């Protein structure tokens, strides 16, 4: 961890809701005048969309039915660790973008599903903000989790996570239920081995729990609304967290354990604002002292 060049990382599976958390942080950064550089985890996949289809077909022909974006084989873990290390030491590093859609690809004159060229990070940023699958990953050869000053896990209960992924991939990307289900099944070993362990390394976890029946996520026609859920917020180290303040500010919240507060689903963004604004301000104070 670096006080002069801090890193915030949001880690969560596909469909977990990390994008909405990123929007909350963008609001905090804008309000507090923090200049951040945002890194999307997709940009550290090893293969672009077309290459991934070819590699997946090759893997299936050899009997590997679990070839996925979640595992080490298909990601540039070493390059991600190098970026975090370089930024923590010098405030610099190399990054690129993954172009998901025609709208994102058009300014670069490229096809969707491709990567831009590697380029240096912008100069004079206050912090690096990562959102993706592997912000807290640790393997035999890399340790990404050691660098973030603040590591946040976004992990709905599994059925809700699947409902969110099914809805997004069907509505926004045009996939069938069968295709999304195949993806979920194919990713399961890597989900267990690479995604889940990260949530034991995070500083804070947000777990949305539905209060409606999600027993069979594959037939759900809609995502449970925020008001139909609760959010369990767990702090790895509760020292310094003003739980009484949070309880007074968030209506219908309560403590379930000494390090855990539960809030209504519709209050998740408010909870994040109340919890993380002081974190960010303290980071900026330490950064100023370290630069002197």
Curated annotation (Swiss-Prot):
It is an enzyme of class 2 (transferase). The keyword Transmembrane does not apply. It catalyses: D-ribulose 5-phosphate + ATP = D-ribulose 1,5-bisphosphate + ADP + H(+). Its EC number is 2.7.1.19. Signal peptide: none annotated. Disulfide bonds: none annotated. The keyword Transferase applies. GO terms for molecular function: ATP binding; phosphoribulokinase activity. Keywords: ATP-binding, Calvin cycle, Kinase, Nucleotide-binding, Transferase. Pathway: Carbohydrate biosynthesis; Calvin cycle. ATP binds at residues 12-20. Pfam families: PRK. One of its GO terms (biological process) is reductive pentose-phosphate cycle. Belongs to the phosphoribulokinase family. Homooctamer. This is Phosphoribulokinase, chromosomal. It comes from Cupriavidus necator (strain ATCC 17699 / DSM 428 / KCTC 22496 / NCIMB 10442 / H16 / Stanier 337).
């Amino acid at each position: 961890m670096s006080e002069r060049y801090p890193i915030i990382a949001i880690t969560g599976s596909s469909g977990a809701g990390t994008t909405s958390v990123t929007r909350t942080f963008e609001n905090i950064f804008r309000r507090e005048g923090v200049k951040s550089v945002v890194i999307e985890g997709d940009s550290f996949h090893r293969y672009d969309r077309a290459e991934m289809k070819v590699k997946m077909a090759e893997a299936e022909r050899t009997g590997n039915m679990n070839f996925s974006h979640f595992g080490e084989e298909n990601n540039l873990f070493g390059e991600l660790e190098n970026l975090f290390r370089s930024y923590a030491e010098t405030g610099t590093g190399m990054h690129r973008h993954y172009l998901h859609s025609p709208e994102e690809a058009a300014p670069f004159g490229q096809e969707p599903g491709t990567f831009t060229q590697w380029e240096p990070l912008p100069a004079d940023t206050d912090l690096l903000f990562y959102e993706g699958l592997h912000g807290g990953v640790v393997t035999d050869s890399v340790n990404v989790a050691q660098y973030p000053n603040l590591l946040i896990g976004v992990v709905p209960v599994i059925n809700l996570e699947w409902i969110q992924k099914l809805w997004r991939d069907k509505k926004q990307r045009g996939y069938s239920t069968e295709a999304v289900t195949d993806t979920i099944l194919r990713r399961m070993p890597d989900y267990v081995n690479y995604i889940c362990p990260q949530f034991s390394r995070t500083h804070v976890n947000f777990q949305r729990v539905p209060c409606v029946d999600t027993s069979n996520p594959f037939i759900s026609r809609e995502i449970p609304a925020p008001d139909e859920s609760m959010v369990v917020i767990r702090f790895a180290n509760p020292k310094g967290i003003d739980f009484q303040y949070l309880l007074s500010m968030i209506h219908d919240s309560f403590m379930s354990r000494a390090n855990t507060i539960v809030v209504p689903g519709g209050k998740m963004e408010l909870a994040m604002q109340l919890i993380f604004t002081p974190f960010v301000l303290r980071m900026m104070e330490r950064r100023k002292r370290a630069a002197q």
